[in-house]
Amino acid sequence: MKEIIAIIRPSKMAQTKTVLEGLGFPAMTANRVLGRGKQKAIVGELGFEVDNKELLNQPGDMRYIPKTMLTLIVPDEDASLVVEAIMKVNKSGQYGDGKIFVCPIEDIITVRTSERGEAAI
């Protein structure tokens, strides 16, 4: 099993979710996050309200910008399909398109049923 963590533009969340659901991957966790990459923030990128305005207005070159972080757990054989789908929706060729991390998962347990492994996905 693989954990896929994708950090994407908030404006691409709905389309990414629709594509993943269409491929049979409706289960995911989404979080609003702040961060920055090599581009040192893109002005006007705000996709949601930020409670702590100080994070957006740091002195100097470093500004944090809102992103959406998706987390999915998929069988090993589906990881490439999911990564390619996320890339297809989110790749514009511009700074800020995001990052995707693929990590191994040792086990999953559903608390309610005690199912383990891929049966728990």
Curated annotation (Swiss-Prot):
Keyword Lipid metabolism belongs to the record: no
Keywords associated with the record: Nitrogen fixation, Transcription, Transcription regulation
Stored InterPro entries: N-reg_PII, N-reg_PII-like_a/b, N-reg_PII/ATP_PRibTrfase_C, N-reg_PII_CS
GO MF annotations, alphabetized: ATP binding; enzyme regulator activity
Keyword Transcription applies: yes
Top-rank lineage group of the source organism: Archaea
Signal sequence coordinates: none
Record-level GO cellular component terms: cytosol
Ranges in a coiled coil: none
A Pfam entry, by short name: P-II
SS bond partners: none
PROSITE patterns hit by this protein: PII_GLNB_CTER (PS00638), PII_GLNB_DOM (PS51343)
PANTHER family per record: NITROGEN REGULATORY PROTEIN P-II (PTHR30115), NITROGEN REGULATORY PROTEIN P-II HOMOLOG (PTHR30115:SF11)
Name of this protein: Nitrogen fixation nifHD region glnB-like protein 2
This protein's encoding gene: glnBII
